[in-house]
Amino acid sequence: VNGMLPSIPAAGNHEYGSDENGTRHLSTHWHPQFTLPMHGPKGLEETAYYVDYQGVRIVVLNTNEQLEKQVAWLDGVLADNPQHWTVLTFHHPIFSAAAGRDNADLRALWMPIIDRYEVDLVLQGHDHTYGRTRNVRSGLSVRDDDSGTVYVVSVSGPKMYESGVHPLMRRVAEDTQLYQIIEVDGDELVY
């Protein structure tokens, strides 16, 4: 399938395993499965990368390892972005609809860059619920739809968690398998 349909995968916790010393490593199945750009930070090639597609820069980050190493790289990728729209995707969520599952470390590292470059949409997974925030800037909801970033957590598999109440979430769902359609038409990105 991956040889026939374009994919932009983000490595999750299940793509990693531990060796006999307890050190986590990316699965040996990852690289043969996908042919991905090699321009990510050293040591994260094919797990942190970006793709420009029809006016959209899609940036994939790796939330499993070397988080700090990706800060300067992400800053550079977004500073040199000629595309009209910017979408980030990664596995572990900054904001989650599942109770107690927000990721403060990711928020502290990456959110200032997301805000600085006015990223439009952040797609995340891991928490087996659905949640879509209002437009967010600096960790707070903004009132207009033309500024801030929308953060989405979604699930397509059968395992589900309970959703919680989160003040930034505009929509929440649990026990629901989903997929998303994103349409870009010039000056309009519809999610």
Q: What is each residue range found by the language model?
A:
Residues 81-98:
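Short acidic, glycine-rich surface-loop motifs adjacent to enzyme active sites
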Residues 187-191:
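Short, well-ordered strand-loop elements centered on a beta-strand within folded domains, enriched
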Residues 109-118:
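Catalytic-core regions built around general acid/base machinery
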Residues 117-119, 148-149:
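Glycine-enriched alpha-helix->loop->beta-strand junction motifs that scaffold or abut catalytic
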